[in-house]
Amino acid sequence: MRSDMIKKGFDKAPHRSLLKATGLKDEDFDKPFIAICNSFIEIIPGHKHLNEFGKLVKEAVRAAGMVPFEFNTIGVDDGIAMGHIGMRYSLPSREIIADSVETVVNAHWFDGMICIPNCDKITPGMMMAALRINIPTVFVSGGPMAAGKTSKGEVVDLSSVFEGVGAYQSGKISEEELKDIEDHGCPSCGSCSGMFTANSMNCLCEVLGLALPGNGSILAIDPRREELIKQAAEKLKILIERDIKPRDIVTEEAIDDAFALDMAMGGSTNTVLHTLALAQEAGLDYDMNRIDAVSRRVPHLCKVSPASNWHMEDIDRAGGISAILKEMSRKEGVLHLDRITATGQTLRENIAEAEIKDKEVIHSLENPHSEEGGLRILKGNLAKDGAVIKSGATEVKRFEGPCVIFNSQDEALAGIMLGKVKKGDVVVIRYEGPRGGPGMPEMLAPTSAIAGMGLGAEVALLTDGRFSGASRGISVGHISPEAAAGGMIALLEQGDIVCIDVEERLLEVRVSDEELEKRKKEWKRPEPKVKTGWLGRYAQMVTSANTGAVLKIPHFD
């Protein structure tokens, strides 16, 4: 066993003595040591209940004849961190999470790991660590929260609350109505109820094969979550016995399938960023061109909030992720069905009994929302290395208009609230990329303000930052290269005409090459916004969005 490094031989007597101080007995040294990587934190509703989950996981691991050791990672609630300096820490927290898991697991030579994530950066951070460490691992997430209902019976979620702010600002609703939405938007523990980043990543974790069937859609408060926990411990023991590791599971084909589900569900644009980072950790050469190829062959089968009024509980009721995959498998060339997963079985075996139970929620191949996926990669002179749009969350497929330029999210939000943006404008928020932000903050507050003011289909928004999974409308993010790296978005000037063509996958500014070259020669890189601390180091080391915004390792001569 891997853990023999710290428990076998006369020279490990000090190690065993320390372990006995934690409560271990001599007989425990013949059992696998299992890391329980939890992310319990009280300020995040998606993680508030994970302390109890950790206890259940440890019980299940002991029942399976193994020895559990629980530890916790940090976490950032993107909703609470939204709209202020806290959002700069969100994406960088992914790297701290991955590094902290790597540190604990490799320092103590565990034989296997069960990860308990749930929200936005915690799930991909743990997945990155699992691929880096490469010991048998199973994920069991905290699960989605249910959607809420206002006193009038209106179904609401966190997206409704953000958009309610814009609606109140523009006089469309009263303060009492906003308070009603606020009070009911997040009714329980769990990850926010729509197809936002947290749920998108937990669904993708299931498809990749690191989590068990049901992981993506079973609600946090559903008793079936406890059964999933028991299964996770049992399956982990099988993975250890068969020496099946994350890099055996997360192959190029598995990533294809993850993006295929993402396209079928119109998931968060953040999945592109995180899954590219996973590919980096797995040592795979996977780029945005391959994502675009997946998008072209996968139909959009279900729309979940913010693209519709359906929520994760509806997906679960309609058959869950397995039902979507089963329907997708009817189209040749969409899925790789014979690859291994954390169940110890193939994807084909995992979904064999699944079926769609509500075709209003999950559409059939014969009746898709669109013939192509709900996410698309755009390129052009504004995004040489690519940009991402959640095409399934807007009915507008072509938009052209003059730029209204802001050099930060705060500046943009203030401008929107002051009425500086009007119908037909293209709002540009730049210097908010991985390096420029730093931390590539999400633009949920500006997009929600635009939508809440009734301009969602009348105004486009471009950024080198990110969008929350709760964002909708004509929102193009992840523009690469970013402004701080001298990308074309830095060269835009007020009033430049920008064209967004979703069908042609095009993002262009109507300015001549000669003029752009002239502007490039005159451009000067702004001073970094942060020069000290973690964010200062992050800004110096982070790579572009099109490579997952991972950290580059400095090379020394």
From Swiss-Prot:
The active site is at 468 (proton acceptor). Binds 1 [2Fe-2S] cluster per subunit. This cluster acts as a Lewis acid cofactor. GO terms for cellular component: cytosol. Pathway: Amino-acid biosynthesis; L-isoleucine biosynthesis; L-isoleucine from 2-oxobutanoate: step 3/4; Amino-acid biosynthesis; L-valine biosynthesis; L-valine from pyruvate: step 3/4. It is an enzyme of class 4 (lyase). GO terms for biological process: isoleucine biosynthetic process; L-valine biosynthetic process. It comes from the Bacteria. Its EC number is 4.2.1.9. The modification N6-carboxylysine is found at residue 121. It catalyses: (2R)-2,3-dihydroxy-3-methylbutanoate = 3-methyl-2-oxobutanoate + H2O; (2R,3R)-2,3-dihydroxy-3-methylpentanoate = (S)-3-methyl-2-oxopentanoate + H2O. PROSITE patterns: ILVD_EDD_1, ILVD_EDD_2. The keyword Magnesium applies. GO terms for molecular function: 2 iron, 2 sulfur cluster binding; dihydroxy-acid dehydratase activity; hydro-lyase activity; magnesium ion binding. Mg(2+) binds at residues 78, 120-121, 442. Coiled coil: none annotated. SUPFAM superfamilies: IlvD/EDD N-terminal domain-like (SSF143975), LeuD/IlvD-like (SSF52016). The keyword Transmembrane does not apply. Its cofactor is [2Fe-2S] cluster; Mg(2+). Keywords: 2Fe-2S, Amino-acid biosynthesis, Branched-chain amino acid biosynthesis, Iron, Iron-sulfur, Lyase, Magnesium, Metal-binding. [2Fe-2S] cluster binds at residues 119, 192. Homodimer. Belongs to the IlvD/Edd family. PANTHER family: D-XYLONATE DEHYDRATASE, D-XYLONATE DEHYDRATASE YAGF-RELATED. Functions in the biosynthesis of branched-chain amino acids. Catalyzes the dehydration of (2R,3R)-2,3-dihydroxy-3-methylpentanoate (2,3-dihydroxy-3-methylvalerate) into 2-oxo-3-methylpentanoate (2-oxo-3-methylvalerate) and of (2R)-2,3-dihydroxy-3-methylbutanoate (2,3-dihydroxyisovalerate) into 2-oxo-3-methylbutanoate (2-oxoisovalerate), the penultimate precursor to L-isoleucine and L-valine, respectively. This is Dihydroxy-acid dehydratase.
